[in-house]
Amino acid sequence: MKAIIFLFAVLTVVAIIIPIISGEPNAGPHAASIDLNEIMKKMGPDLLKMLDDIKTKIQG
């Protein structure tokens, strides 16, 4: 069950939060043409920390 919740949390981050942070004009789940490599270069460490925090909250 926790794994499912974690998966949804990660998908939410990827589909909604990242496009908004990266300034994608059509931010949201439908903005599929995002260049993830560019985003990871810009905010890789922050994103990894955010995902780690989410995982810790779910497991802890």
From Swiss-Prot:
One of its GO terms (molecular function) is toxin activity. It comes from the Eukaryota. Toxin that causes a rapid and irreversible paralysis when intrathoracically injected into insects (blowflies). Does not cause spontaneous nocifensive behaviors by intraplantar injection in mice. It is found in: Secreted. Residues 24-33 form a propeptide. This is Myrmicitoxin(1)-Pr4b. Transmembrane segments: none annotated. Residues 1-23 form the signal peptide. It comes from Pogonomyrmex rugosus. GO terms for cellular component: extracellular region. Keywords: Amidation, Neurotoxin, Secreted, Signal, Toxin. The modification Glutamine amide is found at residue 59. Expressed by the venom gland. Belongs to the formicidae venom clade 2 family.
